[in-house]
Amino acid sequence: METIIPETETIDYLRQMKLTNIFPESINSLTNKEKKSENNIININSEVNFPQNNNIQSYKLEKNLKGKIKLNTKQLTSNNLAIEININYICSYNNILFIANNNELFLYDISDNYELYGKIKTPGEDKNILCLACTEFNDVLYCVMGGEFSSIHVIDVLAVQELTGYQLIGHKNKVYQLEFHPYNKNLLLSASKDCTVRLWNFKIPELLVIFGGPNSFESDVLCIDWDNKGEYFVGSGVDCVVRIYKIDKLIQDCINLSMGINNNMSKGKTKTLLKSLPYFSCNDIHDNLIDCIKYNNKFIISKSVDGVIKEWLPFKDINGQNSFFLINIFVFNTKQLILGIKFCFVDNNIVVGNEMGEIFLFNKEKSETSREVCEHNFFQNNYTQKIKIENNILLKNVHFNSFYNLIFFGGNTDEVYIYHLSKVINKDNK
């Protein structure tokens, strides 16, 4: 079954995924003639039952702060004016935590006492790092970073005392997000302010595909993510349109050709493809620009700058038109539109911060979000748990460690806050 499933298979898939609690029993009778809202959302107005799904884990954040990492950074200045500290990105690989603060990359060993492993600085005092991604290839740990310098830097983590490695050159403007393929670690996806997403074989290095042009992204692409099989990716941004691209046979042939090229062969063997028309697109999901998006199996979780997170299922109707089922809506406190607040999720739980130093945890099983969707009562705070760290701290970045027992928050201070994430035992599942 494809990631974008036909409407005739949508209900069966929802039942297979044990998500029938989202819809009433009468959903079996839904057809194309059923009433739909102006936003192409399936409306369900009958009573909804909420049976428990004991197979999905619930989590909670321990209220006491487990620890803090204080960055060893000097106050940066430009033209005698202090530059605001801004942790733009956090990621980890095994026991190494990567923290991007302005134009510096900090590496910490989080296996024991959070000791500083290394630090590097990007070329140019005013060129900030905006995104990171990590992968291990032939027993070498690589970190790639993008930002205001448009090129993508590839770093050998063992040589972090200086900016070594090479660059992927092709984007014409800022790079906002980087994502490695879930299985083929040669493949790197990048999203940019130049209105394109690009697919690279980062080990050659070679640009394989440009996703852009007519009928494609019309403005800055802020966020991307692969599906769990690496057969599709989703992207969105300033134009508020969600687009899904498929790795079709032509693209796969280009990938296979690049895999046969090594660094000793002459360049130019792989011709860069231009892919314009997406497999799926929809502009009815959010009312504001979308700055974070994630695949969750065949479902998509997306967030807009107005503090609204939606979970939805894309599908093709019987006429081949793009449509979607809205599964959940989560709303968290935000007093202003802030670009770049990221969320993360594990199992059935979503964690996000805001500009007031608050952490929100949403558990889809415990909330009655599905009922709110049915009643169109969207704009409520429906979080399962909220923790206050400190007033007026922008918690823009959130990241789980590899073992999903620690969660890291960072923003507009020189400190990263660490909380312990624990599983909640379901008494009915003993």
PLM regions with names:
Residues 105-109, 152-157, 178, 197-202, ...:
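WD40-repeat beta-propellers
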Residues 90-95, 133-140, 178-186, 225-231, ...:
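Loop/turn segments within WD40 beta-propeller blades
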Residues 221-244, 275-309:
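Repeat-solenoid scaffold signature
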Residues 4-25, 53-82, 113-131, 160-177, ...:
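Inter-blade linker and blade-boundary elements of WD-repeat/beta-propeller domains
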Residues 100-102, 145-149, 190-194, 236-239, ...:
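Conserved strand-to-loop turn within each blade of WD40 beta-propeller repeats
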Residues 399-430:
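Blade-level signature of beta-propeller repeat domains, shared across WD40, Kelch, NHL, RCC1
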Residues 307, 329-368:
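Loop/turn-rich, solvent-exposed surfaces of beta-rich toroidal or solenoidal domains
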Residues 77-104:
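Beta-strand-rich domains and repeat architectures in extracellular enzymes and scaffolds
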